[in-house]
């Protein structure tokens, strides 16, 4: 916010210019009457022009709705002090309190401290030096540890204390006063402020002037320690001082202070943010949330939110949080209600904001009524009804797009108001406004009826649901049948089963959608596809699902370039159908010494990979979009030479940040298989029930009594967490046989281990599994969702009878009837079709 130059001109032309500027600002304020910037500029110009009568009126008007800037507050306080008759100290202090509520600014605190010192030395005033000391202590509490402002407060306070001590040298308690000043210097030198050096110079002066040389060394140690902290903070200050990097510097400074965990420093960091960015809604929200959740001081949170609403009166989030903060601090109901009136009238700009505010205040009233012991919830009902009517008027059909507000309102009327008629009216409105096709909404209405209403109305809702629901109709079927089991008679249960079975059959015979008989478009060649993708510039890198369902990594930049070069040079040749030639990396090239690493933590750094693998030349991470801090969990690592690349491959599954890092050669055409044997290995034992925190060394030491252990491998998940199993390799088969046949209890970390020869089962290949029989259903849930029946793959001539839902008296469960005929096999189907 830029202030108008305060220096007044002496000639008439200057006065005329000011009059013209004042008129321009007044004209602008006609169109933008709530502009804080224009209001502050107008006050400065009016004072500079000498229009004190109008200035006084405008000040009182603007301060009601807008925060004045520090310059306008200092001008107002100065004019207030100079008025006749002279105002009392209490009146001036009240002005300072109002100013500091708007702007917690160091210049205002300095003015207040200077005024307090002046009053303390005025013999006509009753205030003594204790008054000045109290004011300075308040200033330290509000700004003492703030990097850019605390030093000013410390210097002025220490100078006042030294002056008072100098005048008390003959006092009997002189030594006590000197010790107090020394303690103040210690506190000041513990605060890393931008004027720390000046504070230390003043400390040296104090020790020399008041003969405290023996304490200087102690102060110097404190100073040196704090200087190291200041050097860290000064790096952020360089960014803050430059306009283009100001926000970035403030964010980094705040994050640094937050890591310290010291509440006073975190508070000062928040103060710095809201001081520099006073109209930033997010900064105020974070400050209030910290005071509420971390600091847990309701009185501090209330003050923060009250200040925030002065600077951001348009924020519905701040009003919402302020209502709850006022409630936690047990503020008078009148204050809370006044805040609610301002919020309701000024900050609702969308249906979501309106629902959130009305919901917050409605349940605030519920808690208030509960605390008083009353059972009259009519004030809460008025708020719910007002919110529904007002939001419906403002936002039409979009006022409650998810029906959450009306569901809360209906539950309130049923549970607290005991008014089921009103509750049913609200639910009828919900179901009639587009939610009648969802099974969940009907079931919620039925549950409310069962809890607070009667069974007959619940049954009416379920009957209507049978003909209305198109989303997940089976859920309604099952719920209705279960409802009659629990609430109805046998006749009512039979009636429902008949209705449900009738609907199931009706849905099953509905005509199916005709499949389009248009011929499928001819597949495009991969070469055409590649040319189309690359014609607009750089080739597009897509995520492709591999054969195993995992993520197939894109080619590194070097391979992408070589692939395009090969395709252009071999354009005349015709590749085989379905093939795509990839040039093999020549020995000695960069591609030949590039390896592919994956399964990395998204925050793994280059240094951590270099520590795990020796001989790394460069690393290229696959970054996530719009993020330089995290990557996709894999990278291409270029080694110094081919030998280093081969050595790196031997370190496959080396742990990095607690996860096994997968290392493979950079060959997109080669699929990396399982590198361990899946057959019987007589020299290796399989160990089960291994403690998750057991180490390889512990396992090796335990099994060494049976023979020489060559290796130990604990099996882990991809995220590095152990599975609780391991494989132990012996140098001979006899050692492994001895281990299995010993019969000894093998205990490790209070767990008994189970051992057997390593013979893992063959992993089933899902892609080559035996096809299911023709006509075998993949689902057993009846008709699919929606009005259309499920697509049937069984010839009509041999279709079984329509499944019927029956009530078995022995199990009392809903099940599908089974056909007595035997299902046909694939061979029978094949013979039947071959006859034609």
From Swiss-Prot:
GO-annotated molecular function: RNA binding; U4 snRNA binding
Tissue: Ubiquitously expressed.
Effect of loss of the gene: Lethal at the young adult stage due to a ruptured vulva. RNAi-mediated knockdown causes a partial reduction in the number of hatched embryos. RNAi-mediated knockdown in a usip-1 (tm1897) mutant background causes complete embryonic lethality.
SUPFAM superfamilies: RNA-binding domain, RBD (SSF54928), TPR-like (SSF48452)
Top-level taxon: Eukaryota
Polar residues composition bias: residue spans: 816-827
Record localization: Nucleus, Nucleoplasm
Residue ranges annotated for the RRM domain, each copy included: 593-668, 683-760
Main location: nucleus
Cross-referenced Gene3D superfamilies: 3.30.70.330, Tetratricopeptide repeat domain (1.25.40.10)
Coiled coil: none
Keywords annotated in UniProt: mRNA processing, mRNA splicing, Nucleus, Repeat, RNA-binding
Record keyword Nucleus present: yes
Name of a matching Pfam family: RRM_1
One Gene Ontology cellular component: nucleoplasm
Gene Ontology biological process: mRNA processing; RNA splicing
Assembly and oligomerization: Forms a complex composed of sart-3, terminal uridylyltransferase usip-1 and U6 snRNA; complex formation is mediated by usip-1 and sart-3 binding to U6 snRNA. Associates with U4 and U6 snRNP complexes, probably by interacting with U4 and U6 snRNAs.
Summary of the function given for this chain in its UniProt record: U6 snRNP-binding protein that functions as a recycling factor of the splicing machinery. Promotes the initial reassembly of U4 and U6 snRNPs following their ejection from the spliceosome during its maturation.
Protein name: Spliceosome associated factor 3, U4/U6 recycling protein
């Amino acid at each position: 916010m830029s202030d108008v130059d305060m220096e007044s001109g002496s000639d008439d032309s200057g006065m005329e210019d000011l009059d013209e500027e004042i008129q321009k600002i007044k004209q602008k304020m006609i169109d933008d009457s709530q502009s804080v910037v224009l209001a502050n500029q107008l006050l400065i110009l009016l004072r500079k022009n000498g229009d004190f009568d109008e200035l006084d009126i405008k000040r009182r008007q603007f301060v009601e709705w807008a925060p004045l800037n520090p310059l306008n507050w200092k001008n107002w306080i100065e004019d207030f002090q100079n008025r006749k008759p002279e105002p009392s100290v209490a009146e001036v202090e009240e002005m300072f309190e109002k100013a500091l509520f708007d702007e917690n600014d160091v210049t205002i605190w300095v003015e207040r401290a200077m005024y307090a010192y002046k009053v303390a030395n005025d013999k006509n005033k009753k205030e003594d030096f204790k008054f000045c000391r109290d004011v300075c202590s308040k200033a330290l509490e509000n700004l003492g540890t703030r990097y850019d402002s605390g030093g000013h407060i410390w210097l002025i306070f220490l100078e006042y204390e030294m002056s008072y001590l100098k005048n008390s040298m003959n006092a009997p308690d002189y030594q006590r006063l000197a010790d107090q000043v020394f303690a103040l210097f210690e506190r000041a030198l513990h605060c890393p402020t931008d004027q720390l050096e000046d504070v230390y110079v003043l400390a040296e002066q104090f020790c020399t002037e008041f003969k405290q040389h023996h304490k200087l060394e102690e102060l110097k140690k404190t100073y040196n320690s704090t200087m190291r902290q200041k050097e860290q903070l000064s790096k952020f200050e360089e960014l803050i001082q430059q306009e283009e990097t100001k926000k970035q510097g403030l964010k980094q400074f705040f994050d640094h202070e937050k890591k310290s965990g010291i509440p006073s420093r975190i508070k000062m960091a928040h103060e710095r943010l809201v001081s520099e960015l006073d109209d930033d809604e997010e900064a105020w929200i974070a400050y209030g949330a910290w005071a509420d959740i971390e600091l847990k001081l309701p009185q501090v949170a209330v003050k923060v939110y009250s200040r925030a609403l002065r600077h951001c009166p348009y924020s519905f989030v701040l009003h919402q949080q302020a209502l709850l903060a006022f409630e936690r601090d047990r503020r008078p109901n009148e204050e809370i209600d006044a805040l609610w009136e301002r919020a309701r009238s000024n900050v609702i700009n969308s249906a979501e904001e309106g629902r959130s505010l009305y919901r917050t205040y409605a349940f605030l009233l519920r808690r208030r009524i509960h605390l008083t012991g009353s059972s009259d919830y009519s004030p809460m009902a008025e708020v719910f009804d007002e919110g529904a009517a007002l939001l419906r008027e403002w936002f039409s059909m979009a006022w409650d797009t998810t029906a959450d507000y009306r569901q809360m309102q209906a539950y309130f009327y049923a549970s607290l108001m005991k008014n089921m008629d009103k509750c049913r009216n609200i639910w009828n409105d919900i179901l009639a406004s587009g939610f009648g096709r969802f099974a969940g909404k009907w079931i919620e209405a039925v549950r409310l009826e069962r809890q607070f209403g009667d069974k007959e109305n619940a049954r009416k809702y379920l009957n209507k649901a049978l003909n209305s629901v198109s989303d997940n109709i089976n859920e309604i079927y099952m719920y209705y049948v279960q409802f009659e089991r629990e609430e109805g008679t046998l006749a009512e249960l039979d009636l429902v089963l008949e209705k449900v079975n009738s609907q199931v059959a009706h849905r099953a015979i509905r005509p199916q959608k005709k499949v389009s008989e248009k011929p499928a478009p001819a597949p495009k060649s991969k070469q055409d596809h590649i040319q189309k993708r690359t014609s607009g510039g750089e080739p597009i890198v897509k995520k492709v699902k591999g054969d195993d369902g995992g993520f197939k990594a894109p080619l590194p930049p070097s391979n992408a370039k070589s692939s395009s070069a090969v395709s252009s040079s071999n354009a005349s040749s015709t590749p085989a159908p379905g093939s795509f030639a990839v040039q093999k990396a020549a020995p000695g090239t960069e591609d030949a010494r590039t390896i592919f690493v994956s399964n990395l933590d998204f925050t793994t750094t280059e240094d951590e990979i270099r520590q795990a693998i020796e001989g790394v030349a460069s690393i290229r991470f696959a970054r996530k979009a719009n993020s330089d801090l995290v990557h996709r969990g894999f990278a291409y690592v270029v080694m110094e030479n081919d030998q280093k690349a081969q050595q790196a491959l031997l370190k496959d599954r080396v742990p990095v940040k607690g996860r096994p890092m997968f290392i493979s050669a950079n060959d997109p055409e080669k699929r990396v298989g399982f590198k361990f044997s899946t057959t019987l290995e007589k020299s290796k034992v399989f160990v089960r029930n291994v403690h998750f925190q057991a180490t390889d060394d512990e396992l090796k030491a335990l099994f060494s009594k049976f023979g020489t252990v060559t290796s130990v491998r604990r099996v882990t998940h991809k995220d590095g967490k152990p599975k609780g199993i391991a494989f132990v390799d012996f140098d001979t088969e006899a050692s492994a046989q001895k281990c299995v046949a010993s019969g000894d209890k093998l205990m490790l970390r209070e767990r008994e281990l189970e051992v057997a020869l390593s013979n893992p089962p063959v992993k089933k290949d899902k892609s080559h599994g035996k096809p299911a029989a023709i006509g075998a259903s993949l689902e057993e849930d009846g008709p699919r969702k929606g009005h259309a029946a499920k697509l049937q793959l069984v010839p009509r001539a041999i279709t079984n009878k329509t499944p019927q839902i029956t009530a078995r008296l022995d199990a009392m469960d809903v099940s599908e009837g089974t056909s007595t005929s035997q299902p046909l096999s694939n061979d029978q189907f094949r013979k039947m079709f071959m006859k034609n």
